[in-house]
Structure formats: structure tokens, C-alpha cells
């Protein structure tokens, strides 16, 4: 009741007070705890608003488990900060379950993973035609590169493309994405989120370069609110991620003549 709320003591905190600890295995070594702070909500709010195109009247479904960084950042914090109604599904994955869920709750914005999207592709159009999915207006993906075939398929069966996004546990929010106002190039990661400086550094020297079509390591200038502040009890590993004023994502990509990023693979070429 309200009387209990009035007596509840809120722990004093600032924008830089630690708020979330997300564990990430990366590709090598033991899992590392990426520590984020309260200030992260600014990045998650603004990227949810402009990359996922969330509006107050939307019914939003992020299919990620809340124990995963996407399920926290974009399944809880970002959409809540935008005042958006969210749906949570507690059932196993089948095309029938998912399409029924979208139809029943009139989902308008759907954020999912490429693996799930490809599984839906295998189920075919017949599964889609059983349901009224006309409420959908915006589709986005995260978790791994979204292949061009999946983007083309989604436009055919849903009447709209999936917008791929790119970020990591350590970045805390989207770094590169296909946002609503830009043309989607199937298979591309998109472009850097406005206000973030994202580029490529040489694979061997880690020096920044600006050459179209040349593969390098994705790097981000530190300073965005959701950037992780530490690896829990592992300062040496944290410091290794920053070289010459850049945070190194550890992923390789190229940039085309229009500024679109194209994922190539992990820098260490190891599959976890």
C-alpha cells in the first residue's frame, strides 16, 4: 500500500552507480561480468525510440529471455522508459505459438533473433496465412548477423523487412542499426546510431582507417551512456578492450560507399 511505499528507503545513487552486471562469455576465456551503470538508461531509451521506432501506443514484443542482455536492455528497460506496453511469452518456440501470440495480443513492434527468424522461414508461408498478423508495423533483429535471404523473405510474407541491429553486452545499447528512416540493404548491419562515432581499425596494428570495402575491426569512441564501466574483478581484461581512444568490439566488418557496415566475422575467428 501507499503507506509502505512512503516508508521505503531508496538507496542513494548517481548516474554512475553500478546498476546491472551482465555476464558474457565472448569467444575465449572464462565468462566476464560486464558492469553497467544507471546512466545506461539514456542510451537504451533513445535507441529504443529511434532504432525500434517505439511509440506509446505500441504493443511491443522482444522475444529475448530476460536473463540475456537483450532481454534486459530492450525487453525491459528501453521500452519501459518509453512508456510502451510489452508482452512476455512463457512458452516454447513453435511457429504456431509465436504467430498466435502476435495475433492474440495485436503486437505492433517485434524484436527477435535471426536464428528464430530462420526457423520461421522453414515453417513456410502456410503457418503465417492461418493468422491475422496485420497489427505488425515494424520488425527488428539482434543476436547474430541477419542474412539477406531472411530480410527478403520477411518483406514477402509480412510486407516489411526485418531491420538488423548490432551491439554487444559490453556496449549496453545499439551501436549500428538499420533505423526506420533509412533504406535497408539486405544483409547489412546498417549505419552507426546518430551521436556515436563508429569506425574500423586495422586488424594487426589497431590503427583507425577510412577505406571503403576494406575489412577491419569494429571500434567505437568511448563516452556513450551505456558503455560498460568494468569487467567484474578483472581490470586487466577491461583495459585490453581500449586502444588509442577506441573500444574494440572484436568483430570484423567492412564499410561500403554509402556508409553501411557489413559483418565479416569475429576478430579471433573462434566460434563459442
Language model feature labels by segment:
Residues 2-23, 30, 53-59, 136:
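Conserved pre-ATP/AMP-binding loop-to-beta segment of ANL
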Residues 10, 95-99, 128-130, 239:
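Short hydrophobic/charged patches on amphipathic alpha-helices used for structural packing
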Residues 10-13, 187-193, 210, 241-245:
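Short Gly/Pro-enriched turn/cap motifs at secondary-structure boundaries
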Residues 18, 24-27, 60, 102, ...:
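Conserved S/T- and glycine-rich ATP-binding loop of Class I adenylate-forming
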Residues 42-62, 66-109, 119-123:
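Conserved AMP-binding/adenylation subdomain of ANL enzymes
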Residues 81-84, 107-112, 121-184, 193, ...:
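Gly/Ser/Thr-rich phosphate-binding loop
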Residues 210, 219-272:
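Conserved ATP-binding/catalytic segment of the ANL
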Amino acid at each position: 500500500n501507499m503507506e509502505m511505499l512512503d516508508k521505503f528507503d531508496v538507496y542513494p545513487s548517481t548516474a554512475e552507480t553500478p546498476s546491472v552486471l551482465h555476464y558474457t562469455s565472448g569467444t575465449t576465456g572464462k565468462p566476464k561480468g560486464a558492469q553497467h551503470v544507471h546512466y545506461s538508461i539514456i542510451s537504451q531509451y533513445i535507441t529504443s525510440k529511434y532504432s525500434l521506432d517505439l511509440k506509446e501506443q505500441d504493443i511491443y514484443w522482444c522475444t529475448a529471455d530476460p536473463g540475456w542482455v537483450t532481454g534486459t536492455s530492450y525487453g525491459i528497460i528501453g521500452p519501459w522508459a518509453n512508456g510502451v506496453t510489452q508482452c512476455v511469452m512463457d512458452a516454447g518456440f513453435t511457429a504456431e505459438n509465436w504467430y498466435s501470440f502476435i495475433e492474440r495480443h495485436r503486437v505492433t513492434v517485434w524484436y527477435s533473433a535471426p536464428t528464430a527468424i530462420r526457423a520461421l522461414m522453414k515453417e513456410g508461408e502456410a503457418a503465417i496465412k492461418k493468422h491475422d498478423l496485420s497489427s505488425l508495423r515494424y520488425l527488428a533483429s539482434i543476436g547474430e548477423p541477419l542474412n539477406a535471404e531472411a530480410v527478403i523473405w520477411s518483406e514477402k510474407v509480412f510486407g516489411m523487412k526485418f531491420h538488423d541491429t548490432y551491439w554487444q553486452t559490453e556496449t549496453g545499447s545499439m551501436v549500428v542499426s538499420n533505423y526506420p528512416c533509412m533504406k535497408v540493404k539486405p544483409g547489412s548491419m546498417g549505419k552507426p546510431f546518430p551521436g556515436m562515432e563508429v569506425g574500423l581499425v586495422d586488424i594487426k596494428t589497431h590503427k583507425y582507417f577510412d577505406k571503403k570495402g576494406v575489412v577491419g575491426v569494429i571500434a567505437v569512441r568511448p563516452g556513450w551512456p551505456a558503455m560498460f564501466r568494468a569487467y567484474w574483478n578483472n581490470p586487466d581484461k577491461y583495459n585490453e578492450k581500449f586502444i588509442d581512444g577506441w573500444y574494440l568490439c572484436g568483430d570484423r566488418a567492412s564499410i561500403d560507399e554509402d556508409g553501411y557496415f557489413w559483418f565479416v566475422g569475429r576478430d579471433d575467428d573462434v566460434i563459442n
